[in-house]
Structures are given as structure tokens and as C-alpha cells.
């Protein structure tokens, strides 16, 4: 019996799979066991054709392949290559395989290797578990080299790998992928005329990682402003890039030529999105939009039009930064630390409160429209910002609005303050402060205490709202470079908690 080391995926985490191949006498047969899915079972035909087309002899024996551990379901086509190598080694077409080496890849009938998904998390697991060499399809090699302390070989076809293993034509290891400066041309805040108050709110949101709800009539610029928010966010750290790339690798969204995700994600699902497409899951659990927005922005336009059950899936991730998917076979936890940015009209016709008086909705219809969004979800959105219609004078003004670069410089300065504040704590911005941290970093003077108490009683705030206001006030103080939260910082934070929308 021969065992070939390979790897598998459980959510976005890797684990080792032992591909055991046993050749015995009896009628020729080829069985794959160890809880394989349909794609793994189909490997029998791909492997047989690839062996014959690379010039090797397919054994006339009873072949049994076991994928261990058998308790975990094996999915996908990545086991084609280790199954082929196990058969060739068991039939003495190959000598012993290299120690501390793992193999994965899909085969074509001609013996060419095709790329597979989830290579980065598997490579990271391999590097941690003592595997020193990893053989992957050529198109996956750059992604695999993102894992440190691992020698990666990009394999073009079975013939090339067989010659390498026989020491006839040694392959050169893949060069570690080096990131290059990629200037992503994002829409600029300078494109938006007027709306200075809304831009200020978005600057605060970007500086502290706060969630935002934009409410305004059609054409007021809600979507335009939201799509320019990425241009004022700080760059991702290397750790954040690796976390996001792992998720994108599992989802099959990485670029073979530039595998590392270096720009913050901006995900904007349509309002017909299902709960599974948002939260992730399915028969074979995969990351949803919530996880694909990790370290970036999840933008929900026309918020009340989303299915209520889909919106309710946001509640746990907004609090915990992870989404837990439970299935019969077990539970799966995926990272989902994102900024939620939502946009909505104030009523079904969209013109409630507009100076033109064009709204045709009754008060009852307006209230019913607002009730589509649950109070608990709205309570988790830090900032409720009204986006007024743009005035003609603002449209025709000759002065150039502030560019994203200018706003981003202020955001970066505030983030540096937060980075120093939370050094060694494990969070990156004010929005993620725990209640204990709020008590430590959000002290109020007597005037601030009176202001906060008055707002709490008058507005009927919840404990969660209270904490979110203090987090926002801390961010506003950071933007001004102030160590203390002054009453004017607190007053500005309080104004972003709309009560009318919660009625």
C-alpha cells in the first residue's frame, strides 16, 4: 500500500488528507472510498486516461483508493493528482515519493493539470504542519507561494512531474510572488457636488469603521456617495490582505497572475439575494457576500427591498465579526468583519419629505415601509444619515470639492491614533471596541455626562445605541487629534442616531 499526502478544505481552513492506494489481485476494478463526492468519484476516469496519455501503464488490478480521514467529506477535483501518483507508485512506475511533500490538482484526460480553488488556505496549513514541498497546478503556483516556509512547484502536466520525480528533468521551484504597486482608479469624492454633511459622516465612518445608513429621495446621490467610500479607506495591512485572499481563494475569485487581494473589497449584492447568498452555506458550504466583504464594505442598496430573512442574517456578524453556518454534518465559522453601508428611500414612492411635495404615500404607508427593517438591525447601524436633494447652486458651483486623497489623509491620521491605542489588543478601529474598552478609552467630562444622559432619556436609546454613540464620539475626537472626548464631539455623534427612522 502507498500513501500520498494531500490536503483538503473545511470552510476556509485546510487539513491533511492521506490518499491511500492499494493494488490487489482479482477482477480489475477501481474504487474510491472515504466519503468522496461525485467529482472525486469521477476522478477514476480522468486518472485512467491521464496515465495512458502520459505513456505509463495503467495496472490491470483491483485498485482501492481511500481518502483519510474518512469521517470528513472530500469535495472537488484536487485529489486527481495524488490518486494518479499513488497508483503509479503502487504499480512500481514510480519509486518512493519525496518525504514531506504534498500534491493536489485536477487532471484533464490528456494529463494536463488544471487549477483548483482554495490553494492558499491549504498551503498555509501545509507550511504549519511540517510539509516542506507542495506540488500544485502551474496556474495555482503564485498563490501557493504566498505561504512562507514552503517550496512550491507549479506543474504543467503529468509527464513533466513524472520526469521530475524520476530525477530525469528536475523542475525549478516557483519564484515567490512579489506584489507590485497596483493603482486602482476608484471614483473620487470630488465628483460629488454639495452634500458636505454627508461627506463628513462618511469620513467619520471610514475613520472608525462604523456602519452607515443613507436615507434620501431618488437622485440625491446615496449610491454615488457609497461607491466613493472605498477611496477614503486606509490601505489593508498584509495580515488583512492574507485573510481576505484566503476567503477569495476558497470562493474561486483570486487572479492567477496577482493572487493577493490588496484593495478593500466592495460587495454590492442585488436586493433579490437569498439568505444563503448573503451569509454563505449551501450543501457544500461556501463563503457568502458577508464573508467576501471581510475587511471591506458590504453595500446594500434599496435596503427595504431585501428579503427580511436575508437581512436578519446580518445581526450576528455585525456583533461578532464572524458568521456561523450550521449544517447536519457540523457547524462552520467564517470571518465577516465588514463595514455595512446601506441606502434607502424614505418611502415606497421615494419622495417623502421632499420640498416638491411629490410624495403620494400616506403616513401609514410610510410607517409600513420603514417596518420592513427590524429595530434590532437598525440599532446595529451606528450612523443614520439623511441625504437631502442637491440644490441647484451646489450643482453649478465652480469651486472644486475636496478630493478623496485629502479626506483619506485625515482618515489615515485617525487610524494611526487608533492603531497605537489598540496595539497588542487585537482590534484595528474604534467600531470594534468592547464595553470594557469603551469604559477605558471613552471617558466623558461632567458636561459630556449630562449631554449623554439627556440624549439617553429623551431619545429612548438602548445600551447598544449608547455604546455606539461613544465609539463614534471617540472617532470624531481622533479626527481632530483630541485625546479627550469633548461635548461637541459627543453632540455630533448623537445627531447621527436618528429616532424617526426607528419608530
Model-derived features with residue positions:
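P-loop NTPase nucleotide-binding/switch module
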Residues: 166-204, 208, 235-290
Amino acid at each position: 500500500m502507498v500513501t500520498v499526502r494531500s490536503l483538503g478544505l473545511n470552510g476556509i481552513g485546510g487539513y491533511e488528507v492521506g490518499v491511500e492506494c492499494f493494488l490487489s489481485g482479482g477482477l480489475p476494478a477501481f474504487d474510491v472510498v472515504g466519503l468522496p463526492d461525485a467529482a472525486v468519484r469521477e476522478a477514476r476516469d480522468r486518472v485512467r486516461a491521464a496515465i495512458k496519455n502520459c505513456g505509463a501503464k495503467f495496472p490491470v488490478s483491483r485498485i482501492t483508493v481511500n481518502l483519510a480521514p474518512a469521517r470528513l467529506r472530500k469535495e472537488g477535483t484536487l485529489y486527481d493528482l495524488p490518486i494518479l501518483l499513488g497508483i503509479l507508485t503502487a504499480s512500481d512506475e514510480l519509486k518512493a515519493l519525496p518525504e514531506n511533500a504534498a500534491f493536489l490538482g485536477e487532471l484533464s484526460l490528456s494529463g494536463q493539470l488544471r487549477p483548483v480553488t482554495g490553494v492558499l488556505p491549504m498551503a498555509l496549513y501545509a507550511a504549519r504542519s511540517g510539509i516542506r514541498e507542495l506540488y500544485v497546478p502551474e496556474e495555482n503556483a503564485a498563490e501557493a507561494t504566498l505561504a512562507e516556509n514552503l517550496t512550491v512547484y507549479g506543474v504543467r502536466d503529468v509527464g513533466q512531474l513524472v520526469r521530475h520525480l524520476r530525477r530525469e528533468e528536475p523542475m525549478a521551484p516557483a519564484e515567490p510572488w512579489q506584489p507590485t504597486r497596483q493603482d486602482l482608479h476608484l471614483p473620487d469624492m470630488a465628483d460629488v457636488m454639495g452634500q458636505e454633511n454627508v461627506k463628513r459622516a462618511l469620513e467619520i465612518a471610514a475613520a472608525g469603521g462604523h456602519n452607515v445608513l443613507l436615507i434620501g429621495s431618488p437622485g440625491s446621490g446615496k449610491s454615488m456617495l457609497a461607491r466613493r467610500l472605498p477611496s477614503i479607506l486606509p490601505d489593508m495591512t498584509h495580515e488583512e490582505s492574507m485573510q481576505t485572499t484566503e476567503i477569495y481563494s476558497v470562493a474561486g475569485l483570486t487572479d492567477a497572475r496577482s493572487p493577493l487581494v490588496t484593495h478593500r473589497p466592495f460587495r454590492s449584492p442585488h436586493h433579490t439575494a437569498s439568505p444563503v447568498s448573503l451569509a454563505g452555506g449551501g450543501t457544500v458550504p461556501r463563503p457568502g457576500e458577508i464573508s467576501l466583504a471581510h475587511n471591506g464594505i458590504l453595500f446594500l442598496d434599496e435596503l427595504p427591498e431585501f428579503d427580511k430573512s436575508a437581512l436578519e442574517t446580518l445581526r450576528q456578524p455585525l456583533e461578532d465579526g464572524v458568521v456561523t453556518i450550521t449544517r447536519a454534518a457540523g457547524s462552520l465559522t467564517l470571518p465577516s468583519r465588514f463595514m455595512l453601508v446601506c441606502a434607502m428611500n424614505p418611502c415606497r414612492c421615494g419622495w417623502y419629505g421632499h420640498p416638491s411635495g411629490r410624495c403620494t404615500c400616506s403616513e401609514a404607508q410610510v410607517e409600513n415601509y420603514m417596518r420592513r427593517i427590524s429595530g434590532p438591525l437598525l440599532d446595529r447601524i451606528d450612523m443614520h444619515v439623511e441625504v437631502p436633494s442637491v440644490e441647484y447652486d451646489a450643482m453649478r458651483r465652480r469651486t472644486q470639492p475636496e478630493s478623496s486623497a485629502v479626506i483619506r489623509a485625515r482618515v489615515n491620521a485617525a487610524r494611526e491614533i487608533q492603531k497605537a491605542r489598540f496595539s497588542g489588543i487585537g482590534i484595528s478601529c474604534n467600531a470594534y471596541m468592547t464595553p470594557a474598552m469603551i469604559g477605558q478609552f471613552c471617558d466623558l467630562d461632567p458636561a459630556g455626562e449630562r449631554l449623554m444622559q439627556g440624549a439617553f432619556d429623551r431619545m429612548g436609546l438602548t445600551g447598544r445605541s449608547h455604546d455606539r454613540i461613544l465609539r463614534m464620539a471617540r472617532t470624531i475626537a481622533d479626527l481632530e487629534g483630541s485625546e479627550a472626548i469633548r461635548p461637541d464631539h459627543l453632540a455630533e455623534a448623537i445627531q447621527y442616531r436618528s429616532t424617526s427612522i426607528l419608530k
